[in-house]
Amino acid sequence: VHCNNCTSDLNAWVELLAQNAELCGAKVNKGELFTKLFNLSLQGAPDCGGVIPVNYYSGEGVTHFDAGRPMLLRGPESDFSLANLMRANIYSAFATLAIGLDILNEEHVTLDTLLGHGGLFKTPGVAQRYLAAAAHTAVTCTETAGEGGPYGMALLAAYRLHRADGEALAAYLNRCVFADAQSTTLSPDPAEQSGFAAFLTQYQTALKAERAVVK
């Protein structure tokens, strides 16, 4: 499943919150702010309290959009707290992926585990548990989970240089990269699965508004 949109909208919200903190005289370390906000999201409701960000900055093939407009939707009864806002923004990073995985599930494609990798997983145990709920499968993160694309490209270069004759990439990674890697695996929590499912239903409804705005 390929998704064009992930954390751009999340990053924009964190930047806005950083500007607010600076306005109040605080010195903001962006890395620490991300960590605090991610951990705060764990206090949010499993369904994000009716707060629904649509994180589309560009088109999305899975949901058939040629362009995107980031939006935030909520009802008068929604619990518009910072914890719910952050949780909803992280959920939205996985929403289109979850839609794509549901399509694969209908085609009887099954998953044993997913490997979480990239800056989204830098704060331990937050995005990892949300992805597990979204994908209905266990998610593993290594100590290097916070490293992004350059790390992956370096691994590919090392594979090209040092692989044994005929050795597949997966075998090389298991032998030379992940053999001694420290990792954690989280299985989906039933309450969070139900919460994400409720969020995803509202997200898909919100896509109707997104489609109208794009047009």
Q: Language-model segments: which ranges?
A:
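Active-site core segments that coordinate phosphate-bearing ligands/cofactors
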Residues: V1-K215
